[in-house]
Regions:
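Short coil/turn connectors at secondary-structure junctions
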Residues: 1, 21-22, 33-37, 61-65, ...
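Structured core elements
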Residues: 2-3, 39-41, 67-69, 76
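Acidic, glycine-rich active-site loops and adjacent beta-strand->loop/helix elements
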Residues: 5-12, 44-46, 72-75
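Glycine-rich, flexible loop/turn motifs
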Residues: 20-23, 36, 126, 168
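Active-site-proximal structural scaffolding
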Residues: 4, 17-20, 48-51, 59-62
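Active-site/ligand-binding-proximal alpha/beta "capping" segment
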Residues: 35-57
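Flexible glycine/proline-rich, aromatic-decorated loop/lid segments
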Residues: 1-34
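Flexible, low-complexity linker and terminal segments
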Residues: 51-178
């Protein structure tokens, strides 16, 4: 899931055309429980285009929520930028369509730390019932501490796996102020 949040001044302050980054903390920390997500911020109109591509790739590859933040200035602006040439690197890795091994549960971790193998409609042995509630590897609702701990560990492993793929972002301004 990719959520794009174009922020403006608010709430109902008579400032709907003013810029504000008032949703930043809510985007980062505004959830219940241990549900990590990726939060990105676009800095230019061209960056808005590429940020959504990157966000979609992260969301699909790591099966997690990605929030892309922008502000009213970028959200209401128009600016030409060079027509991008399509790149295969924009795409998430393809979902395996071979038969799911017999007995494999929907939340069994695959070789990639913290990631689960997704099935696609029509895939042999790939039909599962999934839940958004706390669950065990078989997707049965489970409130026991062991299942909860395993879910937290799996979500943490996703972030660690993602972190290994990231490049150091550029610094704008005085690097000494960091």
């Amino acid at each position: 899931l990719v959520v794009v949040n174009v922020q403006r001044g608010g709430p109902s302050t008579g400032q709907p055309t003013k810029m504000e980054q008032g949703d930043l903390m809510t985007a980062i920390f505004g959830s219940h429980g241990d549900a990590p997500k990726v939060v990105m911020a676009a800095s230019t109109i061209e960056d808005c285009f590429y940020s959504v591509i990157t966000a979609r790739k992260i969301a699909e590859t790591f099966n997690m929520v990605v929030v892309v933040l922008s502000d009213a200035n970028l959200g209401t602006s128009q600016q030409p930028f060079p027509r991008p040439q399509f790149s295969e690197t924009w795409l998430a890795p393809p979902v395996a369509k071979s038969a799911v091994p017999e007995g494999m549960k929907p939340y069994d971790l695959d070789a990639s730390p913290g990631l689960v193998r997704r099935s696609v409609p029509g895939q042999p042995n790939g039909m599962h019932t999934l839940t958004g509630l706390a669950h065990d590897r078989a997707s049965h609702v489970a409130y026991d501490p062991e299942s909860n701990e395993e879910g937290i560990r799996a979500r943490s492993l996703k972030l660690a796996a993602l972190q290994k793929t990231l490049k150091t972002p550029p610094v704008f301004g005085d690097e000494e102020s960091l």
